[in-house]
Amino acid sequence: RISERYGLGREFGKTVLGEKLRRKIGLVSAALQQKLYPEDSAFEIVLSGAFASIGLYESPSQSVREKAVALLEEFGSIRYADRRYETLSQGEKQKVLIARALMADPELLILDEPVTGLDFIAREQVLDTVEQIAKKDSAPSMLYVTHHAEEILPAFSQTLLLKKGEVFALGKTREMMSGEVLSEFFDMPVQAVWTEDRPYLSKKKTANLNV
């Protein structure tokens, strides 16, 4: 359990400092985006990830700067590295946040609804970035939070379904994203169709028994 007020938590039965946890966990979320300084450049935002800080208060070493450049190049974001964060599109902002989250080589990367509000092209570009990370041998464990099944990439082998704040089901993604399980989950007939190893849901039509 984490105490945001005191920056303390419990890890493996021991009390740890919030900063220690922050360096082990990379986070991409709407809440984090709102805390960032909009006048900072994309490059500065990414650099701040090395220090788990909001804003840049330390002078980054050459190796840290080179790593930030490498991540921006890898995600196709280097062309707007010097632009103010507030001027970026939502999709560009998300890719910058992902690069920021990877600066400290986290053991866990949490992606909390990273493509919410994006159009189709921007959504797929961000998802391509996520898949690109997952394919690396050095990839961190990833926790992807979403309300939309079509965002579930082949890289996510396990799926946990939450309903009213409680665990409804946990298992292999193929099993969880089945019409049978999801019909019970949504309390309505659901059909799941897999395309390119991703599930797409629709309401299953039932025969009209009225005469």
Feature locations, PLM:
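Conserved ABC ATPase "signature" region
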Residues: L47, Q62-Y80
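ABC ATPase nucleotide-binding domains
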Residues: F185-V211
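Helix N-cap at the start of a conserved alpha-helix in ABC-type nucleotide-binding domains
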Residues: F120-A122
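Conserved catalytic motifs of ABC-family nucleotide-binding domains
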Residues: D105
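Conserved ABC ATPase signature
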Residues: R84-L88
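H-loop (His-switch) and adjacent beta-strand-loop-beta switch element
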Residues: T159-K172
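Catalytic Walker B motif of ABC-type/P-loop ATPase nucleotide-binding domains
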Residues: L109-E113
